[in-house]
Swiss-Prot record:
Keywords: Ribonucleoprotein, Ribosomal protein, RNA-binding, rRNA-binding. One of its GO terms (cellular component) is ribonucleoprotein complex. Belongs to the universal ribosomal protein uL24 family. One of two assembly initiator proteins, it binds directly to the 5'-end of the 23S rRNA, where it nucleates assembly of the 50S subunit. One of the proteins that surrounds the polypeptide exit tunnel on the outside of the subunit. GO terms for biological process: translation. One of its GO terms (molecular function) is rRNA binding. Part of the 50S ribosomal subunit. This is Large ribosomal subunit protein uL24. Pfam families: KOW, ribosomal_L24. PANTHER family: MITOCHONDRIAL RIBOSOMAL PROTEIN L24.
Amino acid sequence: MAAKLRKGDKVVVLAGRDKGKEGTIASVDPKAGKAVVDGVNMAIRHTRQTQTSQGGRLPKALPIDLSNLALLDSNGKATRVGFREEDGKKVRFAKTTGETV
C-alpha cells in the first residue's frame, strides 16, 4: 500500500500522552508502521561523556505508531488522506479540503 504519511509532513497526534501536539515527521519506518515526529514522544537518554561529546541527559524523539497520527490540512485541522490520479500520476489529497498534499 502507498504511504499516506511521509517524511516532512506536518501532523497532529490523535492519541496517547502527547495528544494534540503538532510536529513534522523526521523519519518513517513502513515495516514497523511507525514514524519519528519532532518534539513528540520524547524520552531522556543518558549518554556517557567522551572526548568529542559532553554527555549527560539528552532528549530523544521515539517512534510513534502511524495510526496515532493525522495529517494537517491547509486550515490546520486533522484530515484523512486519499489518493487520486492527476495527469497520469498518483497523488495524495486531503479529504477535508480536497487539495493535493
